[in-house]
């Protein structure tokens, strides 16, 4: 009987991270059925280790090799669990590509995820980072996350509150060696409720001649904007936005706006703070379009670090550190990376 996983020793991870940097893993396990996870974790190759769980590789930077075995979940089933006239609860397994899930939901007549179209990566990775774009975060729609708890040796179901979602944050991000996300349950809407707070989204829809958009229209606009602004990882290595927008006290945001005319400021995650544009600060430090060897910053978007071909992860990390130092020097604000960094510290 064939095993529900595939095993590769001394595996290259170049094609498993969207930066396209070379890194190796002592073992790579590809798992087709999350039900076999407990048996897999009991294998001698994984005994006493904390395997690195790898989704689409779109939210990490290998600054060195993976010291522990790597586990890739390939389970990708999706189904509607329950529904009524206003909502539907959907269960998607961790290996389902995120954009494919968004498009599947639209085909089912379900709304809510359209602003998150074309985000790379897998569904299992989405709640870890609490992915967000164009005014929407996935945590708003999560009903529960199913995850293997390595500390307890059991499969757990964490409701939205237990996930502790924040800006690009969750309980899973703070305990990367504890949880392996196996599936996500989402509560989606039956009727369109367009979220058009992001100015560029409304402008894109207007340019498309759409005054009363449905969810598919919004997704089409988001896809057009992303394709125009963000380089395709299949063409040039990148992980999308590399830096988070810093959240600062209201008083500091107002002072920065007085000192730096044009600095975009957005609503924060609480009444007493604001989110300021990392892209604007990076661009005004002169980094947009910068290149040092094969490590660089996209000419189309200052938040995106790119691998022009043969940059190492460490070269990209060193560039990111230089960018952060220049922003701190000029604006007095610390910017932090979105991707998880493997093989080095930030």
Predicted feature residues:
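Anion-binding (especially nucleotide phosphate/pyrophosphate-binding) glycine-rich loop
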Residues: 2-152
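Phosphate/pyrophosphate- and phosphate-bearing ligand-binding catalytic cores of soluble enzymes
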Residues: 8-9, 15-21, 60, 155-314, ...
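Residue-level preference for nonpolar/small residues embedded in alpha-helices
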Residues: 36, 97, 274, 319-320
